[in-house]
């Protein structure tokens, strides 16, 4: 960690976030690529500082041009999404290769996951192995609409039997594992998130600067399936249920009758779709249960399932109460994605998992 990053961390620890931003800015002006990258990341999502995404993206671009691997890694995510930079999947993969060639283990792992190739499997050695891995990635797979099956027409519930690959499932699990925290629910009385007996599982959330290209690829496949933009998606969350853990009956829509939620709907829109990706299936129980529909679904590894949370007019659909039943013997993993009815990408984000 450079002196500027250490100083910024000390300021943040003391609650002096403006001083932290200023320390990073001074070091950036002096050409410190680590500080430049950190400043860019913070400005893009308004992390303990101003929300200046265009400026933040500019700092990442400058750091990348200086040869900084992490800057390239973050730019890869932005480029795949078309967030604050021009959208290009080929450009995103080129940035990932750049980071991998400069030693980024995260970039190397993402390339392996997307290519479906185990480490060291017939791609040779040296810097060119990462380019060869990138060339194996089937971009059409991630950007075309997969074949699906309707489980319920009204309200709509659809399943995709071949939604993501095993290597992507493994990556998503291992990426989330060290970042898991007790999952919370919103308490409308206290106006804050709290732990509650109705939800006993763990979760790891990823904002724009902590998401990676594998997660974005999954989001793009979701986008093709539902016909809505990735820019309408909140940050992805990976959920973990140990044996006996659950979330009881609940709704995913934003309830306009809860104080302050009507303002959120006006600002960010309604959560109209929930998309789940099942990352393992070696457990008993653990179904996704829709009691009002008489439907329970035990997802297979790599399968996707989405359901609507709102009526055509945007009002909450009370039929869509659902639960994550407890696994009876082993753990359960899945990726959860909320999709809104308006653009939310680029909004100020809370600091989430690293």
Task: Give names to the regions the model predicted.
Residues 1-3:
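TPR-adjacent "capping" and linker segments in tetratricopeptide-repeat scaffold/adaptor proteins
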Residues 30-33, 45-47, 65-69, 81-83, ...:
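Short helix-capping/linker turns of helical repeat alpha-solenoids
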Residues 6-15, 20, 26, 41-42, ...:
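Fe(II)/2-oxoglutarate oxygenase catalytic core
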